[in-house]
A protein has these predicted regions:
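Bacterial carbohydrate/catabolite-sensing allosteric modules
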Residues: 1-136
């Protein structure tokens, strides 16, 4: 659970292909629910600390983080937490499971197909799905 950690850190590289609105959504969430937070562009100069939850959007950052956790003998899901952006099959298996937050691809695909078939243009907010696993 997020409440057992002292701070949430979003790792969001400036060169990410993900929309910048993710950062503002993260900040809004943390402020709304009174979480301490920090946005970092890279893990290169960031020390991994007990009591932190890291949200990674890029797979490279997830791997760097997992390697540091292993090298520093930290207990994932107890001393430190991870939430990774976008569900993939490997995340079910890594370290007994990495928690994920993903866009609802089924709804996204269905809505996109409806728009193509009806020759419409529309803008909508697609829902997200959170899957809690051992990393949190």
């Amino acid at each position: 659970s997020l409440v057992t950690y002292q701070q949430i850190r979003l790792v969001f590289p400036t060169q990410s292909y993900y929309p910048k609105e993710i950062v503002q959504g993260f900040i809004n969430f943390c402020r709304d629910y009174a979480f301490e937070y920090k946005v970092v562009e890279s893990l290169v100069d960031v020390s991994v600390s007990v009591g932190q939850v890291y949200i990674t959007v890029m797979e490279d950052d997830l791997l760097i983080l997992l390697e540091r956790i292993r090298n520093e003998s930290l207990q994932l899901g107890k001393e430190i937490g991870i939430i990774s952006y976008n569900e993939t099959p490997i995340k079910r298996l890594l370290f007994d499971g990495i928690s994920t937050i993903s866009t609802d691809f089924e709804t996204l695909g269905r809505k996109a197909a409806e728009l193509v078939l009806s020759n419409e243009r529309a803008k909508w907010q697609n829902p997200f799905v959170f899957i809690s696993r051992a990393s949190l």
